[in-house]
Amino acid sequence: MREPKRILFVSQQIFPYLDEETPIRLQNRQLPEYFQSHGFETRTFMPKFGEINERRNQLHEVIRLSGINLIISSTDHPLLIKVASIQSARIQIYFIDNDDYFHRRKGVVDANAVEYKDNDERTIFFARGVLETVKKL
């Protein structure tokens, strides 16, 4: 029996975790769903922005994947990994979380549609967090 092929999806935004239903958010959900239904093993990652309600979306921390520190701009930042499922699509979403970078922010822009000044650091943290987590999966 052959092992299933594996695909890693990494996205900044996936519906339904960010409220507004946009074409890109739907696509970022539908692609993993499509490949999963065709026998591929998929893993999907996104940042755990502050507007994502942990209780409503049933996120829980994955202790065995959390707990390392990533150094960004000479500062240690703890990496927290949370997971939730989209039941109707039968896919799991892994969330990269850190209070400094994601906790109080809705996305990559503020309420006035201005990009946050540390978006570069946040993106680096997110990318490195995905890579470190994939090593442990």
Roles of regions detected by a PLM:
Residues 48-136:
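A conserved catalytic-core segment of Leloir-type glycosyltransferases
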Residues 38, 136-137:
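Alpha-helix C-cap/termination motif
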Residues 1-84:
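N-terminal subdomain of nucleotide-sugar transferases
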